[in-house]
Amino acid sequence: MDSKTIAKIAQIASALEVSGYPKPGNVHRTRDFEDMEFEDFIISGIVIGDTIEKATSKVNKNCLQNARLGKYILDAVKETDKWIANNTNLGIVMMITPIACGAAISDDFSQLRKNTSQLMEATTVEDAVDLYDAINIADAGGMGDQDEYDVAS
């Protein structure tokens, strides 16, 4: 599957995820929060498209450790942060980036799980550092404080 198609699927998936109803305790199409609205999530889903397209166009099944999943997660969060003040898509970006890259190197759907797993296993220390930066930029809540390896420190 080509990178443009994969990016559009990622955008559509993001928009549909927030459109589900009901989503107890979460923003959805009939319930906003004081600091987040349904439209913030739609915008967030749209603005990740270019980053997902770039990530999927660069991934190479013969050199998985160079996939840079963490970099593209960070790039997507930075792009979202330009448009939206709150964390509206860190979770979906963390999930969809490796799946999208797995799709890019799969000849058919039956290879997606294996290829995505191999991409995840090939992540590097740099990916982890970029992921920590993405979590901090997104200002993700609910992480709790840790004595050691606290994501906020």
Question: Where in the sequence are the language-model features?
Answer:
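Long, hydrophobic/aromatic-enriched structural stretches that serve as scaffold segments
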Residues: 54-109
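Phosphate-rich cofactor/ligand-interacting catalytic cores and adjacent structured alpha/beta frameworks
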Residues: 1-67, 104-153
